Amino acid sequence: MTSGGKSKGVGSEPGVRVIAENRRARFDYTVDEKVEAGLALTGSEVKSLRDGIANLSDAYALPKGDELFLLNANIGSYKAASFFDHLPTRGRKLLMHRGEIDRWTAKVRERGYSIIPLVLYFRNGRAKVELGLCRGKTHEDRRHDIKERETKREMDRAMRRR
């Protein structure tokens, strides 16, 4: 029998520190694929992330030319940077292999997928983002997910009572 608790994810590995999660994305979208990407950041952005000042709730990624950019990700300003501070919601270049960028860009352009950031974290001192290739859920899909979750809870309760 398996033990309770969280499933193995990004934050359960050694050397990984989760900064921000996009919990709303898992409710609004069906995630078909995931990939890890690096971020091109300024020094004040890295320091803000180390302080945990980030929000991914409205963020998404878009292809521009041969590159992918993370847009609307809010990395708060770093107090000590004053003059050299960054814009909180500026576009940030995503660092991925050329083949991955081309494959994901093709899927986004032809099949109605979106690229949504799921988790922002540090892995061995480097800022990374877990991106999901997502398709929007319909109202019926959301209801189905809620119903599945409820039946699973009821089964767990029944098993504990035995």
Swiss-Prot record:
<dbReference type="GO" id="GO:0070929">
    <property type="term" value="P:trans-translation"/>
</dbReference>
<dbReference type="InterPro" id="IPR023620">
    <property type="entry name" value="SmpB"/>
</dbReference>
<dbReference type="Pfam" id="PF01668">
    <property type="entry name" value="SmpB"/>
</dbReference>
<feature type="region of interest" description="Disordered">
    <location>
        <begin position="140"/>
        <end position="162"/>
    </location>
</feature>
<keyword id="KW-0694">RNA-binding</keyword>
<keyword id="KW-0963">Cytoplasm</keyword>
<protein>
    <recommendedName>
        <fullName>SsrA-binding protein</fullName>
    </recommendedName>
</protein>
<comment type="function">
    <text>Required for rescue of stalled ribosomes mediated by trans-translation. Binds to transfer-messenger RNA (tmRNA), required for stable association of tmRNA with ribosomes. tmRNA and SmpB together mimic tRNA shape, replacing the anticodon stem-loop with SmpB. tmRNA is encoded by the ssrA gene; the 2 termini fold to resemble tRNA(Ala) and it encodes a 'tag peptide', a short internal open reading frame. During trans-translation Ala-aminoacylated tmRNA acts like a tRNA, entering the A-site of stalled ribosomes, displacing the stalled mRNA.</text>
</comment>
<dbReference type="GO" id="GO:0005829">
    <property type="term" value="C:cytosol"/>
</dbReference>
<dbReference type="InterPro" id="IPR000037">
    <property type="entry name" value="SsrA-bd_prot"/>
</dbReference>
<dbReference type="GO" id="GO:0003723">
    <property type="term" value="F:RNA binding"/>
</dbReference>
<comment type="similarity">
    <text>Belongs to the SmpB family.</text>
</comment>
<dbReference type="InterPro" id="IPR020081">
    <property type="entry name" value="SsrA-bd_prot_CS"/>
</dbReference>
